[in-house]
From Swiss-Prot:
InterPro entries: Aldolase_TIM (IPR013785), PRAI_dom (IPR001240), RibuloseP-bd_barrel (IPR011060), TrpF_fam (IPR044643). One of its GO terms (molecular function) is phosphoribosylanthranilate isomerase activity. NCBIfam families: PRK01222.1-1. Residues 211-234 are annotated as: Disordered. This is N-(5'-phosphoribosyl)anthranilate isomerase. Pathway: Amino-acid biosynthesis; L-tryptophan biosynthesis; L-tryptophan from chorismate: step 3/5. Keywords: Amino-acid biosynthesis, Aromatic amino acid biosynthesis, Isomerase, Tryptophan biosynthesis. Its EC number is 5.3.1.24. The keyword Mitochondrion does not apply. HAMAP family: PRAI. It comes from the Bacteria. It is an enzyme of class 5 (isomerase). Belongs to the TrpF family. It comes from Afipia carboxidovorans (strain ATCC 49405 / DSM 1227 / KCTC 32145 / OM5) (Oligotropha carboxidovorans).
Length: 234
């Protein structure tokens, strides 16, 4: 299976269209008011309607309550819930059972020891997203444009398909993919001219770079122990 490319934090129809036309596999919508990429439900529903059938839709939340999650499920109908907070494994399992969406759990990395945080989620999530650990004074857990040491993931077996995130952009993607063999890559700030404002040319450049850097086949879910599929039926 080819590398999955996800453009996250989209908030305008024009840049969403740029991502879709350039061949993005997934698009992410952020539901977290402290983020400059936050979208309200009405805008999210509009964007999701444009993307549906052309790319998978991920709804990014941070320790969201049931009211918000219910509204997202009803109005946006995402394919994925992308959880970037401190959601414990039992909460992730409950969300996976409650909503008609697969679950991607973000895990922040700073050292190789942080990989131990993945194990409790292997049986309750469908995919892991590795991001850089946010600074202590950060107001949001991701989208900060900060990479982590990709060598942390060299030879790692997280037990689930995983997405590489954190500080990626068109100019460093080939270096990252030379060290790590992810199921997919995720970018947000790396395709922005200013914080929270996506740039269509940068989106296209990132997707081109991802395709060029991933010319060899990617692992398929279930192909090996490191990529065991744990997806909700249906």
């Amino acid at each position: 299976m080819s590398l999955i490319v996800k453009i996250c934090g989209l908030s305008e129809p024009e840049t969403l269209e740029a991502a879709l036309e350039a061949g993005a596999d997934m698009v992410g919508l952020v539901f977290f008011p402290p983020s400059p990429r936050n979208v309200d439900l009405a805008r999210a529903a509009e964007l999701a309607a444009r993307a549906r059938g052309r790319a998978e839709i991920a709804a990014l939340t941070v320790d969201a309550d049931a009211r918000l999650l219910d509204a997202i499920a009803r109005e946006v109908r995402p394919d994925w819930l992308q959880l970037h907070g401190n959601e414990p494994p039992e909460a992730v399992a409950a969300l996976r059972e409650t909503y008609d969406a697969r679950v991607m759990k973000a895990v922040a990395l700073a050292t190789r020891a942080d990989l131990a945080k993945v194990a409790p989620y292997v049986s309750v999530a469908d995919r892991i997203l590795f991001d850089a650990r946010a600074p202590k004074d950060a107001t949001r857990p991701g989208g900060l444009g900060v990479p982590f040491d990709w060598r942390i993931l060299e030879g790692a077996d997280p037990g689930l398909p995983f997405v590489l995130s954190g500080g990626l952009h068109a100019d460093n993607l080939s270096e990252a993919l030379a060290l790590v063999r992810p199921h997919g890559v995720d970018v947000s700030s790396g395709v922005e001219r200013t914080i929270g404002v996506k740039d269509a040319d940068m989106i296209r450049a990132f997707i081109r770079a991802a395709r060029a850097a991933s010319s060899s086949p990617r692992p398929v879910d279930g192909e090996s122990p490191a990529f065991q599929r744990s997806e909700k039926a249906g």
